[in-house]
């Protein structure tokens, strides 16, 4: 069960795709989803999630400023669950991932977000959605230590 927001001209195609995928979402599930929306539970839940993710985003931003070496830069997203960070010194984040994993931290190298993998060699996507704030701080600290070591700082 889900919803989509799209131009009206595309809606028929999406309905057909949904019908082709599973024929019909169960009626009971539809009634429950409708009740959740009508009573405001979904709106309340989304509001709570926004607060949680904002705290985690802000925690990551603060930790980056505290623990990462000079020359690194990152986005300050207004939405989503990820930060985009760039590192200096010719570090290829595909290769650096091995050092990060040794420090028990993972990220997605930036190159994987380029269609021909022809860019983003110095970039990484960092996820703040899953971990609690204290884990985010520790992970960013560990990455900072590894980056400083890789840069000889």
Where are these regions (language model features)?
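PLP-dependent class I/II
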Residues: 1-153
